[in-house]
């Protein structure tokens, strides 16, 4: 599962997957490792990173650095989403919808780690198609970034928030 580390910058770090890969050359195989990580501040910022190196710790470090560089802002509504969202990347498709207080994170695998570090506490989520962790993480972040608050939608349409909410 995901390994959690806390840091001075108040960013939560989670290691989602480590994979051994090899390159075949004339003299044999060259082994290396890849790492997939997510980081977030637990308050609406989330990023993912993918690192590759000859040793596991170096791959994890590269992935964490990349994740910290790629932070995205997510609009939250009291620990859940404002509206249902769908994200797609390659063969993976994810669907997430807001849940009432006390529901928890109903999601599996790599998607759960992304939602936890983003600061989402109540959500219903489902992965369709490929469950490859890299594609699921990218689709999840894509879906979260698409989410908009009623204030953003009202500004876009030139209306007041009360008119949007009905």
Curated annotation (Swiss-Prot):
Q: A GO term (biological process) for this protein?
A: translation
**Subunit and interaction comment:** Part of the 30S ribosomal subunit. Contacts proteins S4 and S8.
PROSITE patterns named in the record: RIBOSOMAL_S5, S5_DSRBD
Question: Which keywords does the record carry?
Answer: Ribonucleoprotein, Ribosomal protein, RNA-binding, rRNA-binding
UniProt GO MF annotations = rRNA binding; structural constituent of ribosome
From the Swiss-Prot or TrEMBL record, give the protein name: Small ribosomal subunit protein uS5
Q: Report the residue ranges that make up the S5 DRBM domain in this protein.
A: 11-74
Give the InterPro entries listed for this entry.
Answer: Ribosomal_Su5_D2-typ_SF, Ribosomal_uS5, Ribosomal_uS5_bac-type, Ribosomal_uS5_C, Ribosomal_uS5_N, Ribosomal_uS5_N_CS, Ribsml_uS5_D2-typ_fold_subgr
State the similarity comment. Belongs to the universal ribosomal protein uS5 family.
Q: What role does it play?
A: With S4 and S12 plays an important role in translational accuracy.
Organism of origin is: Aeromonas salmonicida (strain A449)
Q: What is known of its domains?
A: The N-terminal domain interacts with the head of the 30S subunit; the C-terminal domain interacts with the body and contacts protein S4. The interaction surface between S4 and S5 is involved in control of translational fidelity.
Might you report a single GO cellular component term? Answer: small ribosomal subunit
């Amino acid at each position: 599962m995901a390994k959690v580390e806390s840091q001075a910058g108040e960013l939560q770090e989670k290691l989602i997957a480590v994979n051994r890969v090899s390159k075949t050359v004339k003299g044999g195989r060259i082994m290396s490792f890849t790492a997939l990580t997510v980081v977030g501040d637990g308050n609406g910022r989330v990023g993912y990173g993918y690192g590759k190196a000859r040793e596991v710790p170096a791959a994890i470090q590269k992935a964490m650095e990349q994740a910290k560089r790629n932070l995205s802002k997510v609009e939250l509504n009291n620990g859940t989403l404002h509206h249902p969202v769908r994200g797609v990347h390659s063969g993976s498709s994810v669907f997430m919808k807001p849940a009432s207080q006390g529901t928890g994170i109903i999601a599996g695998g790599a998607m759960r780690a992304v939602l936890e570090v983003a600061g989402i506490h109540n959500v219903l989520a489902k992965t369709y198609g490929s469950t490859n962790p890299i594609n699921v993480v990218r689709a999840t972040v894509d879906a979260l970034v698409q989410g908009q608050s009623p204030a953003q939608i009202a500004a876009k349409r030139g209306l007041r928030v009360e008119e949007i909410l009905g």
